[in-house]
Amino acid sequence: MPGRAAHQEAAAAGGAAAEPTAAGGSAGAVAQQPEQQGLAGAFPLVLKKLMENPPRDARLDKEKKIKLEEDEAAAASTMAVSASLMPPIWDKTIPYDGESFHLEYMDLDEFLLENGIPSSPTHLDLNQNPLMPVAKLEEKEPASASTGSPVSSSSTAVYQQSEAASSTESPPQNERNTPSPIDPDCVEVEVNFNPDPADLVLSSVPGGELFNPRKHKFTEEDLKPQPMIKKAKKVFVPDEQKDEKYWTRRKKNNVAAKRSRDARRLKENQITIRAAFLEKENTALRTEVAELRKEVGRCKNIVSKYETRYGPFDLSDSE
């Protein structure tokens, strides 16, 4: 009996121990289900994080790939623009430091020969473009006007009237070439001549204009030498005979003598100042003539050199 009781107690204890185990198993299964549901919900979040923030190595690879594609596109465009393998001219830089920069010598005659340009004017063919005489040119003008577009009758009439007026007004060619005569009085020579104002006053007629040595001209009578007049012999007149008639005649003679002396001195002063100016003007004109002769000689030398090289002038074409 005691053994049976002990066996029953042991079985009861085992059953009690088995119940907690079963309860623990069911509790573990219930706890495992929420954990699986949490992992399934966290996977999309992790994937989203990976897409937004990829690893560094993957990002570097992507940047290298994009840069490589851009370089290939730029190379393709460069090759499309220029088929040359050399870089463009504008990308080159030429250093200029005085030593590495050198100018190349080129012979001018060789350059002209390579390009087919004559080296001297004697090789030019003047017959390629000959100058047309004026007469032929005038003959061609009405022909070209007749073959051109038609013009209204009113404009044609106006043109003919103006042409007729110009033809009547225009002088002949010979008259046009001849220069108009120059008045010698209008020619002024630059002369450094400054006479004394006192001499000009003494050479001027009292109450008249100031004497101008540049413009004044003398007549032939003025320049003739004055005749020598012999003075009358002095006649002694006693004081008893010096009446009113004597003194009147004496005053008239003195006034006439003074007037003649003043006129003679005035003319002498004018001639002296005029002669001084003419001497200055003559010197200036001689200098100008010498310079003009030098210029004419230089022009003659140029013309002679031209004629010896190209032949004489053809004045018919120029006319």
Curated annotation (Swiss-Prot):
Basic motif, as annotated region: 245-265
Q: Where in the cell is it found?
A: Nucleus
Outline the segment boundaries, as ranges, of region: Disordered: 1-35, 139-186
Q: Pfam families annotated for this entry?
A: bZIP_2
Residues annotated as transmembrane: none
Domain of life from the UniProt record = Eukaryota
The annotated consequence of residue 285 to V reads: Complete loss of binding to VTG2 promoter in isoform 3
Known tissue expression: Isoform 1 and isoform 3 are expressed in a variety of somatic tissues, including liver, heart, intestine, stomach and kidney. Both isoforms are also expressed in hepatoma (LMH) cells and in embryonic fibroblast cell lines. Isoform 2 and isoform 4 are expressed in adult heart and intestine.
The record's keywords, sorted A to Z, are:
Activator, DNA-binding, Nucleus, Transcription, Transcription regulation
User: Where is composition skewed (Polar residues) in this entry?
Assistant: 159-180
Task: Quote the cellular component terms of the Gene Ontology held in the record.
Answer: nucleus
Q: Which GO terms describe its biological process?
A: positive regulation of DNA-templated transcription; positive regulation of transcription by RNA polymerase II; regulation of transcription by RNA polymerase II
- Domain named bZIP is located at 243-306
Q: Where is the composition biased (Low complexity)?
A: 1-31, 143-158
Q: Could you tell me which InterPro entries the record lists for this protein?
A: bZIP (IPR004827), bZIP_sf (IPR046347), PAR_bZIP (IPR040223)
Q: Where is this region: Leucine-zipper?
A: 266-273
Cite a single GO MF annotation: DNA binding
Known PROSITE patterns for this protein? BZIP (PS50217)
CDD domains tied to this protein: bZIP_HLF
Q: How does it assemble?
A: Binds DNA as a homodimer or a heterodimer. Exists as a stable dimer in the absence of DNA.
Its family remark reads:
Belongs to the bZIP family. PAR subfamily.
Question: What job does this protein perform?
Answer: Transcription factor that binds to and transactivates the vitellogenin II (VTG2) promoter. Binds to the palindromic sequence 5'-GTTTACATAAAC-3'.
Q: What is this protein called?
A: Transcription factor VBP
Origin organism of this chain? Gallus gallus
